[in-house]
Amino acid sequence: MLLRKVLTTEECRRLVNEFDASATRQLEGDAFYRGSIGLYQPPASLALVERLQRQLEPVFGSLEFENSYLRAYLKGSILGIHTDRPGLDVTLSVCLEHDFEGEYPLWCSRQPFFGPWKDNLESHEAWKSDAVALELALGDGAAMDGIRYPHWREEFKQDGRAVYIFFHWRRRRPPVTEPPKPTG
C-alpha cells in the first residue's frame, strides 16, 4: 500500500537532523544490513506514530505500536531479503532523504512466506521472481504485512545516500473473554 506524502518535508528534515546528530547510530556490518547506518527509535519519530497508525488501521485493522528504526544507505549498502520478526506484523517504510541520482526501490514479494524467516535458504527465487518495486519519493511511505511478505533492497550503487524510517506495529488481538468450552 503506497501512501503519498505521509510525512511533510519538515518532518523528514527533523528526523534526518536527529539521525545525523545522534551519537547512538550504528554502522551495520552483518550480511543483511551491510554498510548501512541505523538508529533505533529516534525520539522525534514517536510524535508521528498516532497519526500514521490512524491512516493504517482502516486497511490493517487495530494496531499497537512496537518501534521505529531509521536507516541510511550508502554506496555498497544492502537490505537483504527477509520477513520481519514476530511482533512486527505491519511495517511502514518512509523516505526521509533522497540525496542521489536514480531510484532505490523497496522490493516486496507478492508471494507470502509462512513461519520464521530462514536465513539459510538455498534460493530466494520463489519470492524474488514475483515481486513489486516500490519507489518512494521524499515523504512517501509503503505499508505492508512485513511479517508475511519478504522484502529487501538491492545494493545501493549510487553516490550520496538514501535515508528511510521504518515504523512497526503488531496487530491487536481481541481479548479472550471466555475460556474454550471442552469438547467430547
Go through the PLM ranges and name each one.
Residues 1-60, 78:
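Non-heme Fe(II)/2-oxoglutarate
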Residues 8, 86, 159-160:
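Short strand-connecting beta-turns/loops that link adjacent beta-strands
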